[in-house]
């Protein structure tokens, strides 16, 4: 069973929906408006926005645009998926990842959104075109490559809320012994201390 997947979908009807996510999600609005409700506040996302949804309940409303259906592309992933991809990017390509960004938005919300930068916008537009190909939906390797590319584009970008939320998801997987060893591989520490 695949641990993450791509989902592109359209919506014609409008209603507030409760979504209970068991994985993290990163998405992009291709057309329409998305409202995310949190208590008595409403955040508006429009065409060209990239967004992050954390695990848990989200109250969302998707609006069509000018008679055309609402359209978005979503990637779902687990902390283990993210950890595996980041380790691959670091070991294979030497990608050093850091993040100094922290703001009230990142700390207190289970969702964040921002206008997409050029490379991420192009990525999602191309991914949407790939999703129109039926064979793509059955190609796990293509999905893995797309997910790795998405993580790279976010992790290599300047510090921002999306990057901060994404990288905070690795912490949930840090209990993994392999990750602990990897974290200490260049430190003067014994195997006994690691265990």
What is each stretch, according to the model?
Residues 120-123, 127:
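Amphipathic alpha-helices that form helix-helix packing interfaces
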Residues 98-118, 131-193:
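Short, Lys/Arg-enriched, Trp-marked, Pro/Gly-tolerant hinge/linker segments that flank
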Residues 25-27, 168, 195:
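Small-side-chain structural scaffolding
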Residues 74-80, 105, 127-129, 173, ...:
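Juxtamembrane/interfacial segments around transmembrane helices
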Residues 89-92, 127, 184:
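Alpha-helix boundary/capping residues
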Residues 2-99:
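N-terminal regulatory/effector-sensing and dimerization cores
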Residues 1-2, 23-27, 126, 141-145, ...:
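Short acidic/polar alpha-helix capping motifs at helix-coil junctions
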